[in-house]
Each structure stands twice: as C-alpha cells, then as structure tokens.
Amino acid sequence: MLRVLTLNLQHCLPGAGAGDGTAASGSLAGADIRDPATARAVLTALAEQITELAPDVVALQEVDLGQARSGRLDQAAVLAELLGWCHRRFAAGWAGPVTGLRRRPLHSALARPADDVLGPARAVFGQGPVGFGNALLSRYPITAWRVMRLGRGPATLLRRGSPIDPRSYRLFTATARNLLVGRVELPEDVLPGVGVLNVGVTHLATRAETAHRQLDSAWGALTTLPGPHLLAGDF
C-alpha cells in the first residue's frame, strides 16, 4: 500500500494548539517563526506529526523558500531532512519576497542565483534565492521531475472608502500557480505490478472558473505521462 499525504503549509505559521500532544517541541501556538530557531522548531513538530501518519509521499502547498516571515529557511529541504528523506523538489510559483517585487522565476527550483532574474544581484549582497510555491517529498527514489505553469486568475480591484478618493482603491494580483510532478519508483511490495507512479502536486486558484481551467490543464498534462498517475494538492 502507498500512503500519500497532501498538506497546505501556509508557510508553517502555527495555529491554535500547534505542537500540542506528543510533539517534543511543546506548544507552539503564536510562535514568531521569523526567528530561524523557532521556525525550525515548528518544522520539527510538523515532521513528528507527519511521521505518525507514516506517509510515503508528501505533497506540500504554500511552501516558503528563504522568506523573512519564516526564518529564511528552505522549508522543503529542512522538512525532508527531518523526515530522513533524500528525495524532494521545490517548485516556485513566483520568486521574490512576499512583501516585495514578485516575479516569474527563470527556473522553478530556485536552487541557484541564476534561477531568478534578480538572483545574481542578490548574491552580491550575500542573499540567496527567495520564493513561494509547491513541493514534493518522497521516501522512495524520484527519477524525473516536471513542472508546468498553470497561469493565474484576473486581478481584483477593491474599494474601501470614498469612491472619489484614489486612496480607497487597492489592486490585488492573483498568485501564479504551477504543477510539480515527480516520477516515483516503487518497491514491488508497495503496489504490486506498479513499478512507477507519476505524482503531481498543485494549488488551485480560489476563483471557481480559474480553478476549473487550472485543474483541466494539470490533469491533462499529468495523464500524458506514461504509467499510472495521481494528482494531490489544495483544490
């Protein structure tokens, strides 16, 4: 049997009761994860809870890479390390800080400065890549990766205040979405007769019409790959 867990991290912001129960780090509700040590403690508690569920593959959404709000950690890498898994991949929906200039990454992994148009400039000041997106972790080997852009929905203009005051208006742009697929090699006793499984992870838009289009694109791309396939995520 193969166990797949999908989880929206919400950049590991701890909610009420976080860390209670058997987690060694104790109660983390309200913890300030801008501190790297605290951010790692939250990931440690999460790794313990994931371990209790005994999954073989973990599909993650809303994952931070190098963001100040979450201790500037590579959340996917740290979580994979805490789980003792060697196979993982992060795919940025966008590069850049949450509160700054967001941009399309040149390469979704954001593994090196050249993967972001502003990466070389950041490297001059000793700053690594920064982004936000999906990730896939696996206890079993992953022999190939694919990433597909799913686009974004329309921008939204909101008004709070007088209709004749320009300061009353704010423009909110939709978040870019993507599909990350890993080709997972499975032992014979996990799913007899299934040597490989294409596992995809995505996070759809909140607008129904945009989400439907993104889901069609994601599923269509996944089903073109040889072998069985599974799509996980936040729908």
Where are the regions a protein language model picked out?
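Active-site catalytic loop in hydrolytic enzyme cores
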Residues: 116-132, 136-190
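Active-site metal-binding loops of divalent metal-dependent hydrolases
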Residues: 8-9, 63, 204, 233-235
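Conserved residues at the C-terminal ends of beta-strands
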Residues: 61, 91, 148, 205, ...
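Metal-dependent phosphoesterases centered on the DNase I-like endonuclease/exonuclease/phosphatase
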Residues: 78-81, 207-235
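Surface-exposed cleft-lining segments at the edges of enzyme active sites
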Residues: 29-36, 63-65, 150-171, 201-209
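Residue-level detector of structured alpha->beta connecting loops
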Residues: 54, 84, 139-141, 226
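Glycine-rich phosphate-binding loop signature in dinucleotide/nucleotide-binding domains
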Residues: 51-54, 186-194, 223-227
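N-terminal, active-site-proximal structural segment of metallo-dependent hydrolase catalytic domains
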Residues: 1-131, 197
